[in-house]
């Protein structure tokens, strides 16, 4: 996949993410599906909104060491956001990610090895794809939260943001 193809693919993840965030009921931020160790709705909104920032970090080859990344992530997932807060954060982080990726040379996108905190060094496009899929997984998680809460979401909401 080339850089333009990736950006098109990532836009397809972003658009429904923004729509799903906007549908989250602000009065249910403390809700989670059962007495299990998962994020609350508010924590998930915050986390989903910050996911694109990691794509910008990957594009800059600027991930911190694994222990520092893990510690920061553990702290970050404890934070919560309302839909009104998460929406603008998602948009800002998405714009920064797109700008950073657009600024890459195609050769670097395709072949530059970068350090990632979750495993051995990998090719830039693979790290970006991993982070895009991470966001996609949390988009699906939010979709399921909203479905369980009885909101009128469906396949078009999940994949087209409608």
Identify the residue ranges that each predicted region occupies.
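Residues within well-ordered alpha-helical secondary structure of globular protein domains
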Residues: 23, 47-50, 92, 103
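Short, low-complexity N-terminal intrinsically disordered segments enriched in polar/charged residues
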Residues: 1-4
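Hydrophobic alpha-helical core bundles mediating ligand binding, dimerization, or RNAP-core interactions
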Residues: 10, 14-17, 21, 90, ...
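Acidic/histidine-rich alpha-helical segments that form the ligand environment
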Residues: 75-115, 122-137, 141
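Short, contiguous alpha-helical
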Residues: 7-11, 15-18, 28-75, 115-162
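Surface-exposed helix-capping loop/turn segments at secondary-structure junctions
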Residues: 23-31, 100-111, 148-153
């Amino acid at each position: 996949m080339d850089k333009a193809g990736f950006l098109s693919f990532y836009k397809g993840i972003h658009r429904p993410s923004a729509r799903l965030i906007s549908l989250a009921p602000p009065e249910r931020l403390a809700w989670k599906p059962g007495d299990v160790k998962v994020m609350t709705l508010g924590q998930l909104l915050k986390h989903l909104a910050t996911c694109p920032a990691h794509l910008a970090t990957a594009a800059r080859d600027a991930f911190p060491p694994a222990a520092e990344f893990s510690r920061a992530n553990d702290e970050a997932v404890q934070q919560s956001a309302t839909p009104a807060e998460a929406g603008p954060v998602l948009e800002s982080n998405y714009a920064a990610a797109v700008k950073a990726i657009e600024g890459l040379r195609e050769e670097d996108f395709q072949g530059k090895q970068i350090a990632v905190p979750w495993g051995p060094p990998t090719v830039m496009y693979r790290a970006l794809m991993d982070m895009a899929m991470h966001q996609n997984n949390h988009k699906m998680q939010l979709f399921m939260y909203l479905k369980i809460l009885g909101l009128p979401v469906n396949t078009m909401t999940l994949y087209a943001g409608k």
